[in-house]
């Protein structure tokens, strides 16, 4: 029996809530199949399987042709995120970077303005933690398991930080388990198969660092004699001494630095933020493809496919990169009133789709475009959170 099958999908946001009615997800009427709107080299929704589908949950394919929403709706975005994460967690029974891993990490961050994270999320993370704790140590350092453990620890740390402001024993267990999966060089193993979120050991190391950064009291309370203290230092030294493979990785490093500046991972913080302004498109958004050369995203034939895209496709602003940058800059205490950030937020406000998603074309295949999920999580965080108290003053462009 599926562990969530008897639980209704609900939230507390009024008319747009998710609720199972007569065996059909009420939100599904928003997630309709879109007809072809022109030729751009992409498959159309009618040619694609649903993006998420499990029992009563059905979310149709993400496409570039999906109509824009008449106005920005945090309710629609939250509904899409909730349904997608539930469907993946119930169906796949695992942590994925692109869906429930991103949801677990980001969802608690906007709990103040959009309500608390659902209880099922923590229950799912706890079941995953217990399952991984039963594995032999060698099984924790294989395939993408180290990355999954990093997202698990980050999700629990985020929950504690934004819901309770204290570290739970479960988060302590998850962080310690995560470090059991650490590689000798301080990184965390990951196959370079599904960029950008599953692209390298470096990317996984930044997620692990973010997990610790979201629980600052935990790391500060580590005794020097605790073996984990040496492992944490190894992680910090890896990120300090290993050149970031591309600008995308540097954005994540900046995100870690926003929460744990004491580590000194980004020496010229303001210079790097200025570089982000320089990469901003004229419409106010950013393009993920502008943050790494095609060959830098991983092995396989991906580079050839990316190079075959038109210049317009490569340079087009997308929800993933724009949402990520706007969210990270707000975590860096850049004010909403900063002209360049304001342009980015305005792009997000005007580019949501009718389903509640933000569009972003996958770097990998033109089938599921799961990158739209993290795009929506980052975009909603950027639009829903208030900036942190300033610790660095950023100049106007």
Task: Label the model's feature ranges.
Residues 46-72, 90-116, 134-176, 183-231, ...:
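An alpha-helical repeat/solenoid feature that recognizes helix-turn-helix modules
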């Amino acid at each position: 029996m599926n562990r969530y099958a008897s639980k209704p999908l609900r939230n507390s946001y009024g008319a747009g809530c998710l609720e199972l009615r007569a065996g059909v997800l009420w939100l599904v009427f928003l997630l309709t199949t879109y007809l072809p709107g022109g030729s751009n080299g992409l498959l159309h929704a009618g040619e694609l399987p649903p993006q998420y589908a499990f029992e009563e949950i059905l979310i149709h394919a993400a496409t570039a042709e999906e109509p824009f929403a008449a106005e920005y709706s945090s309710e629609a975005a939250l509904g899409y995120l909730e349904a997608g994460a539930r469907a993946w967690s119930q169906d796949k029974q695992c942590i994925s970077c692109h869906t429930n891993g991103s949801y677990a990490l980001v969802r608690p961050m906007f709990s103040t303005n959009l309500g608390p994270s659902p209880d099922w999320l923590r229950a799912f993370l706890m079941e995953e933690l217990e399952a991984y704790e039963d594995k032999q140590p060698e099984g924790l350092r294989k395939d993408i398991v180290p990355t999954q453990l990093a997202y698990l620890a980050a999700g629990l740390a985020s929950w504690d930080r934004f819901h309770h402001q204290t570290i739970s024993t479960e988060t302590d267990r998850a962080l310690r388990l995560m470090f059991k999966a650490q590689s000798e060089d301080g990184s965390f193993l990951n196959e370079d198969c599904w960029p950008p979120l599953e692209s390298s050991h470096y990317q996984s190391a930044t997620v692990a660092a973010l997990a610790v950064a979201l629980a600052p009291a935990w790391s500060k309370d580590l005794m020097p004699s605790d073996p984990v203290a040496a492992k944490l230092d190894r992680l910090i030294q890896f990120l300090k001494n290993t050149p970031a493979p591309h600008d995308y990785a540097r954005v994540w490093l900046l995100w870690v630095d926003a929460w744990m500046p004491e580590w000194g991972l980004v020496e010229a913080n303001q210079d790097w933020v200025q570089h982000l302004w320089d990469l901003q498109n004229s419409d106010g958004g950013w393009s993920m493809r502008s943050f790494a050369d095609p060959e830098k995203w991983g092995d396989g034939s991906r580079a050839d496919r990316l190079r075959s895209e038109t210049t317009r496709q490569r340079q087009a602003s997308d929800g993933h990169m724009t949402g990520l940058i706007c969210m990270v800059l707000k975590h860096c205490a850049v004010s909403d009133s900063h002209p360049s950030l304001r342009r980015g937020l305005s792009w997000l406000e005007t580019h949501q789709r009718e389903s509640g998603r933000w569009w972003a074309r996958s770097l990998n295949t033109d089938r599921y475009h799961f990158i739209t999920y993290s795009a929506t999580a980052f975009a909603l965080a950027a639009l829903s959170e208030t900036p942190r108290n300033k610790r660095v003053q950023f100049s106007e462009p």
